[in-house]
Amino acid sequence: NKFENQVKIINEDIKNYKNIFNRDEFDTIVTNPPYFEFTGDISQTNDLEQLANARHNIDLTLEEIIKISSYLLKNMGSFSIVFRSERMVEVLALLQKYKLEPKRMKNCYTKWNENSKICLLEAIKDAKKGFSIEMPIFVYDENRQKNEYIENLYKSSDLKIKKE
């Protein structure tokens, strides 16, 4: 996708960010953090440790992700996040706490007749106020067919990322 020379994969614990990166170093941060808040009850997680860490913020909280992102982003840098709709209030409060101004959001619906489970949100560091809720994404239509919009996303996302 012609970004091979602009993307560098770093396999490191994000909590070491101050040892690796400078403040205000990035123009854009995109994150798909664990969706579920960990309450301390291990029975709420999957038996497989990798899946538990991927689904529950056991080792890294949502607040840590947003705080670190704010530190790393340049002024007017873009922060994009995917999260569970049920955590909307928490996400908005944390973004504003760390000077990431919510700018636009899309709700995602698995089916046209169900509530939104996932939200996509973009915030800008140190931006002026102004927020829009964009047209939603429906994964499946009323005939249980994958939505044309989703099909086109899959077709256009032929990512080729080079690991270093």
Could you describe each region identified by the protein language model?
Residues N1, T31-F36:
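Amphipathic alpha-helical repeat scaffolds
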Residues N16-I29, E37:
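A short acidic, Gly/Pro-enriched loop at the edge of an enzyme's catalytic core
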Residues N32, I65, A123:
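Residue-level signal for inorganic ion chemistry
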Residues Y35-E64:
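Mobile active-site "lid"/loop adjacent to the S-adenosyl-L-methionine
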Residues I58-S116, L120:
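Conserved Class I SAM-dependent methyltransferase catalytic core
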